[in-house]
Amino acid sequence: MSLEQLRTGCVIRFPYLWVRQAERGETEGRKSRPVAVGVRIIRPKGEDVLVLFPITSQPPSPDRFAAEIPETEKRRARLDVTLRLWIILDEYNQDTIGRSFYLEPEPPIGRFSKAFFLPLMKEFIARRAGTRGVNRRR
């Protein structure tokens, strides 16, 4: 995968580790799943930090900060249009390009439109204090 392809809104496969799993002492994601690259923080030496949000078919509880993915966006991101899917925005994984044990050398699956994804990122930034992350950086 070209490192330049890892930009805000692109969808990749990643062994996402849920916060609840990390709190129980797990260190590895149980399966590779689609995740959205939310933010790419530019760092020296090409070791940029990615903030990754999970995509799931499990309906989130009402108290979660999540957004259902519309059919048009599922098509753009090349996700299964026959499933109801949500992007979870109150938790995330962080990983570092160039030092990751988890990023696969595959091109992104697809990409969300700016019209759909950027308002979600603005809301994430506004709610950042109430979110939880798992640092996958090594």
Locate predicted features.
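C-terminal terminal-subdomain/extension
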Residues: 4, 69-138
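A broad, low-specificity signal marking well-ordered, structured residues that form hydrophobic/aromatic
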Residues: 12, 50, 67, 86-87
